[in-house]
Regions:
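N-terminal targeting signals for export/organelle localization
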Residues: 2-68, 229
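Thiol-based oxidoreductase modules, predominantly thioredoxin-like and allied folds used
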Residues: 122-137, 154-166
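Short loop/turn microsegments at loop-to-beta-strand junctions
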Residues: 66-67, 89, 191-193
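Thiol-/selenol-based redox modules, centered on thioredoxin-like
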Residues: 180-229
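Short active-site neighborhood of thiol/selenol oxidoreductases, capturing the structured segment around
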Residues: 79-109, 128
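Short helix-capping segments at alpha-helix termini
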Residues: 117-122, 150-152
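Short, internal strand/loop/helix patches
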Residues: 143-191
Length: 229
């Protein structure tokens, strides 16, 4: 006998509240980032309860992939979530004239791009950067930025679109912060987290994009993730 429980609000709310606290307060403990052979899942989920012949109840949790999206990249081509199915993807949110954390985050992403190319060239890795200031980050501007940091555009897309669509994707899809702010550097308050997605576009980890140690953990976790069937 099976029962499917959709939108279990109490469990989901507790999970999301804990995650948001970690993200908003920046209380990531690198020691706690060590992983076993199986990485955790994050985000919304369904629980299916199964009752066996012996009356034993079992719960099977299914996590949702990130939401659908469609944005223009640095070459004015439409990119959707389907372009990342089957790949392990590193995702960040940035803007090209960001005066604070973005240059550091982009440099860390570029460093891992090179590290993967040299040490694991056959790994199905992709990189994805969403502009949180898309009203000024045109495809041409994104292309110049990507070239400036040495991005391999065969594996790394920089996306722009309607501001609210990107804010909603960050906040509702990735559970991360992104919104205009008069008090934030560059006029946008946004997360410093880099998200690790598995081949099914499910969120499997959050990392401090300004920390070499945290990004090295991401590198290790991506390799672990590549071994999942």
């Amino acid at each position: 006998m099976k029962r499917r429980l959709n939108n279990i609000k109490t469990i989901k709310a507790a999970s999301l509240t804990l995650l948001c606290c970690l993200i908003f307060l920046g209380c990531t403990d690198d020691k706690a980032s060590s992983r076993s052979n199986s990485l955790p899942y994050f985000g919304e989920f369904d629980i299916e309860l199964t009752t066996g012949a012996d009356g034993t109840a079992q719960a099977d949790t299914s996590y949702y992939p990130i939401p659908k999206f469609s944005f223009l990249n640095q070459d004015s081509l439409w990119i959707t979530q389907k372009d990342y199915e089957g790949y392990i993807t590193l995702v960040d949110f940035f803007f090209t004239d960001c005066p604070s954390i973005c240059p550091v985050m982009s440099a860390q992403m570029a460093r891992l791009q090179t590290k993967f190319s040299l040490e694991h060239p056959d790994l199905p890795i992709r990189f994805l950067s969403f502009s949180v200031k898309p009203e000024t980050d045109t495809p041409d501007k994104l292309k110049r930025y990507a070239t400036g940091i040495g991005a391999d555009l065969s594996r790394w897309n920089f996306l722009t679109g309607k501001p609210q669509d990107i804010y909603d994707l960050a906040q509702d899809g990735f559970l991360l912060t992104a919104f205009p702010s008069d008090t934030a550097a560059g006029g946008i308050f946004h997360t410093d987290k880099v998200t690790l997605l598995d081949r099914s576009l499910r969120m499997r980890g959050y990392y401090d994009g300004t920390s070499t140690k945290s990004m090295d953990q991401l590198f290790t976790d991506a390799i672990t993730l590549s071994k999942e069937s």
